[in-house]
Amino acid sequence: MKCAAAAPAPALEKDDLFAPYAKGVPKVTTVISEETKDGVKVTKLRFASAEGSKEGEVKDCEIYAIIARPANTAGQKLPGMLVCHGGGGMASEGGPIAWAKLGYVAIAPDLPGYGANDKMLSISRVTKMQFGADQIIPPKPTPYVCVLFDAVTAGLRAFNLLEAQPDVDPQKLCMTGISWGGYMVTMLSGLLDERVKGTFNLYGSGFYQLDAIGSDALKKMDEADRNTWLKCFDAGTRLNRCRATFLMYSAANDAFFKPPSVMATFDAIPVGKYICFGPNKSHYMSLPGGPVRWEYPINAEIEPAFFAHVLAGGNPPLPEPNAVAVTRNGKVLKFTVKNCPDRAAGWFYVSWLPDQPRGWEARDWAR
């Protein structure tokens, strides 16, 4: 499904806690190493960022990141890719190197607060915290107590650093993320508006208050705290500013980001958007284009083709299915497909609910 182009994004509110970090190139504090191998130059470094504290104050920190690019980019302007790791992950070189081999300049930062905190090479408060601590908590005395402030700020600063690279075309910036990284690219796409051209979200979502990881924690907060947390940290509240062409790959039986939150996220994206649900799997996509092998360094095999489509201005056009209104008799469902490729095949998956309600993870989808 794809929507018409939206109007220019509204300005980010001046008092938004992320406004100071949405623009401006962060200082590279340390270059740890540089190496060229197999036609790819890999730079490992730390850059200046910000983190919160138990006292609700903002402090300085340093974020570890890996930048990969083709070995010789002199005189070139290449597309840029921000690679966001998932929950329990950290910056790793596999993704950036894979994108560099496809002609991108790519950056993969630590995203402290939802990663492998104790293994990260960042200089951050979270390296002494357990994974999952202080993510979805009452924002008291200020929202800066929440470690998602650290993570989102690191993502913003990494994007700004990528955008400033001399061999990067600032008009061709994209981002990809898996799980919590899918949350991150959704959040950043809203905060960064027209600066992001294409976004791929594998399994993540916004609208945590509906049916996603952290929903129970949000329900336990009092209303004022919950509303503050959602305003500051829920990716769904940011999507009115998103202007990226968006592709969501989600699992219909996901245990973490379930269809109600995923569909609310999709509906809130005001511009070009596509979605695909994989049946009978949690946090895995079994359909063509998904992560069919775990050692694949890019999150899903459809990504290179999707981003090539975005950066080519939407060419060639992707298939767009549209439902056709028919008289319902329990057996007929019709749809048309615009831009349908030759020899295409289509099929339906249906979930029949029993008398007793069943959670999304336990549904059976029959083809």
Residue ranges of predicted features:
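N-terminal cap/lid segment of alpha/beta-hydrolase-fold proteins
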Residues: 20-76
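Gly/Ser-rich "nucleophile elbow"/oxyanion-hole loop immediately N-terminal to the catalytic nucleophile
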Residues: 72-76, 126, 131-178, 196
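Short beta-strand/loop motif that positions the catalytic acidic residue
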Residues: 242, 248-250
